[in-house]
């Protein structure tokens, strides 16, 4: 294990590990996040973290991306262009279900967000506060999008951020590498799944 100390009560936050984004085939398969999650062992690593947190009675929290029927889209950018063309991630559909490998158990909370910030209007902040959480272990997809946004949102709220680099990914491996190596270390601890479990 590396030399660091876990501060306060931790929670595991799993971002956007849902059917439409991660399963193959799926409506958003072309983004590559699901392929990367399977090929790089990210799903298995998150499974290990889930088992470790549950086994110690620690919170496991999920965030799911959903697209409101009446949403608006910004004018510029590939994400918005693609979103305008797809009817995907509607509440109550297969798209927004957590992948079966990481399915929540009764009592575990799911928060629904749109588009990127898992805190904006979701109640996640209030829930973490109610549990006395001080440290968040951040996992999921995609490193350069919602996981990255979640990291900054956690930092802005002064949570102690831990990112297991092998428990998140991005369809663009260069983006993942850059964020993990050059951005996250400024606002949190970047380590491995095994190391996190060893410190629980």
Tell where the protein language model's regions lie, with residue ranges:
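Short glycine/proline- and charge-enriched loop/turn segments
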Residues: 27-34, 77-85
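Short aromatic-enriched loop/helix-cap "lid" or pocket-rim segments at secondary-structure transitions
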Residues: 26, 72-76, 176
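A short alpha/beta connector and helix-capping loop motif
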Residues: 8, 26-53, 58-65
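Flexible, glycine-rich phosphate/dinucleotide-binding loops
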Residues: 21, 69, 170
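Short acidic, Gly/Ser-rich segments with clustered Asp/Glu that frequently serve as metal-coordination loops
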Residues: 18-24
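Early exported N-terminus immediately downstream of N-terminal targeting peptides
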Residues: 59-60, 64-83
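N-terminal nucleotide-binding beta1-loop-alpha1 segment
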Residues: 13-17
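Active-site-adjacent betaalpha module
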Residues: 1-11, 47-56, 79-200
């Amino acid at each position: 294990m590396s030399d660091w100390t876990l501060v306060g009560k931790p929670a595991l936050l799993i971002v956007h590990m849902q059917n439409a984004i991660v399963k193959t085939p799926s409506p958003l398969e072309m983004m590559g996040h699901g392929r990367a999650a399977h090929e790089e062992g990210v799903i298995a690593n998150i499974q290990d973290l889930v088992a470790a947190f549950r086994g110690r009675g620690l919170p496991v929290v999920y965030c799911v991306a959903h697209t409101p029927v009446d949403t608006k889209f910004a004018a510029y950018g590939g994400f918005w262009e693609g979103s305008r063309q797809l009817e995907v991630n509607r509440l109550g559909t297969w798209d927004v279900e957590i992948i079966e490998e990481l399915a929540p158990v009764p009592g575990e909370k799911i928060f629904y967000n749109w588009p990127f910030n898992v805190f904006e209007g979701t109640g996640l902040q209030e829930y973490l506060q109610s549990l006395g959480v001080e440290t968040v272990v951040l996992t999921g997809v995609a490193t350069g999008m919602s996981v990255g946004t979640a990291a900054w949102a956690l930092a802005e709220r002064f949570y102690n951020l831990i990112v297991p680099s092998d428990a998140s990914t991005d369809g663009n491996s260069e983006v993942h590498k850059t964020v993990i190596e050059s951005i996250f270390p400024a606002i949190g601890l970047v380590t491995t799944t095994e190391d996190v479990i060893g410190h629980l």
